[in-house]
Every structure is written in structure tokens, then in C-alpha cells.
Design a protein with these regions (language model features):
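Short Fe-S-cluster ligation motifs
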Residues: 12-30, 232-240
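C-terminal accessory region of radical SAM enzymes
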Residues: 117-130, 149-182, 201-255
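Canonical Radical SAM [4Fe-4S] cluster-binding loop centered on the CxxxCxxC motif
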Residues: 1-8, 19, 205-210
Length: 256
């Protein structure tokens, strides 16, 4: 299946709430979570725990007005958060200031206008929780200032300028600037993230695109899987980087 079932997801959220208590659940690891037919139920399940928030990243809005209004009502009806976060966050990958540049990044059949419309529509329903995002690339660097000025005024200064992630050398290097710290600090993602695939397998981090399962959340406890990760973090702190970590420059980035 291309989707995690609601039954499995519900079980997983119960486990996360017990394990962490306070967490931000990102539904958009490498794909478009707005394509999931039960997205509204997923959001409702997450928000049933006052210590959990939800993050959704998208490039285009694949949700009907009916589904959006339903999600908006779910968010409004849920309790205030106890984790210091908003109930829900939306990040829209705009990445451009015009159609020509947008097509270079998102493909010929993509629509810059629809991406901008997604930001505005979401902002009308989820006030102060929507962020247009610009990922800096060689293809769009000249559009950065235009993007920044427009959305700073249009969206009450809520926007994200994101560095390019080349997945530790798996993708072509399209970075426009080297932003890495002089001193390499312990990886934020090893310390804070828990990457779960739709079949329940857990990878060491989101940069690991190939086989590296640390366990499965549906057959093991989250505590046991988390303990397995400690070796990687301890090695990182000591400067003993594995092949993936050696090439990776995401260690200083984080969302929450």
C-alpha cells in the first residue's frame, strides 16, 4: 500500500504520546501527505492529545474546500496545546517568485499561481500557522529577494528560507552558499527526530534513503528503538562519523 492505514496510525500516535508526551508530528517526510484520503482523521487523532502538534509540508494544495473546512473545524475544536506550539503548522514550498523559475524546480505541469493560492487559502483558515518556504538553489537564487519582500508583507513576516538538502551526496549539489558552522555541533536530528516510514520501519534519520531499519514501531517499543540510536549519537559527539554523517551538512538544521 502507498498509504499508512488509519488503524496503524492511531496505534502509533498512542505510542508516541506515551513515549514522548510532547512532540510535533510531521506527516510529510518525503511525500505529499495532502494526498492521503484520511488526512483529516490523522490530524484529529494527533490533536486528541494536547501535548502533540502536527506539521504538514506541501507544494500544491491537494485538498477540496470541504476537506479543508473539516480540518479547520477539527483544529478549532481541539484543546489548547501544552507543548508551547501551535496546534498545526503548514509549510508551502513556493521556492520561486514567478512561473518560469517555479517550473524549473517543480516541473512543467506545476503552477506557481496555485502554490501561492495555497498559502493564501490556508492562511485564511489557519491564522498565523502557515509559512511559504523558499529553498535556496542555483536555479532560483536571483528570486530570493523578491520572494522575501513579497511574503514578508503579504504573510505578516511568516516565511522560511531553507537550505538545499542534497541527502549526503545522494542528490546533485545545488547549494548556493556554505552555511555550516565552523565547529561541528552534535546533530540536531539524531537528538530530536524519529523517522518512521509508512510500514513502521524506523531509519536512523531522514537523510538515510536506503536500507537502515533500526526496528519497527508496530512490533517493538519506541523506547527500545530509541536506545539503538544512542550509539550513532555518541559516535557523532566523539567525531567518529559514519559514511552518511561524514557527507551530511544537515546536522545544524531543525524545525522545532
Amino acid at each position: 500500500s502507498d498509504f499508512m492505514s488509519y488503524e496503524n496510525f492511531s496505534t502509533l500516535i498512542d505510542k508516541i504520546a506515551e513515549f514522548s508526551g510532547e512532540a510535533v508530528i510531521s506527516l510529510s517526510l518525503w511525500g505529499e501527505s495532502t494526498l492521503h484520503p484520511q488526512l483529516d482523521l490523522f490530524i484529529e487523532k494527533i490533536l486528541s492529545y494536547s501535548g502533540l502538534s502536527v506539521l504538514i509540508e506541501l507544494s500544491e494544495l491537494n485538498l477540496s474546500d470541504e476537506k479543508l473546512n473539516k480540518i479547520s473545524q477539527i483544529v478549532k475544536n481541539s484543546e489548547a496545546r501544552t507543548n508551547g506550539k501551535e496546534k498545526i503548522y503548514w509549510i508551502v514550498s513556493v521556492d520561486a517568485a514567478n512561473q518560469e523559475v517555479y517550473e524549473k524546480i517543480h516541473g512543467k505541469n506545476s503552477s506557481f499561481e496555485q502554490s501561492c493560492s495555497a498559502v493564501l487559502k490556508l492562511s485564511s483558515l489557519f491564522e498565523n500557522c502557515v509559512y511559504p518556504q523558499f529553498m535556496r538553489l542555483k536555479e532560483n537564487e536571483e528570486s530570493l529577494e523578491t520572494f522575501y519582500r513579497f511574503w514578508k508583507e503579504k504573510n505578516d513576516e511568516k516565511l522560511i528560507i531553507q537550505k538545499y538538502d542534497w541527502f549526503a551526496g545522494f542528490l546533485e549539489d545545488k547549494k548556493t552558499a556554505d552555511l555550516t558552522p565552523i565547529t561541528r555541533n552534535p546533530c540536531w536530528h539524531l537528538r530530536r527526530d524519529f523517522v518512521i516510514l509508512l510500514n513502521g520501519d524506523v531509519t536512523i534519520c531522514r537523510e538515510e534513503l536506503l536500507n537502515s531499519s533500526q526496528g519497527n514501531v508496530f512490533s517493538e517499543s519506541l523506547e527500545n528503538i530509541w536506545q539503538k540510536r544512542k550509539t550513532f549519537l555518541e559516535d557523532f559527539v566523539k567525531g567518529n562519523y559514519n559514511q552518511l554523517c561524514e557527507k551530511c551538512d544537515e546536522y545544524y538544521t531543525f524545525n522545532f
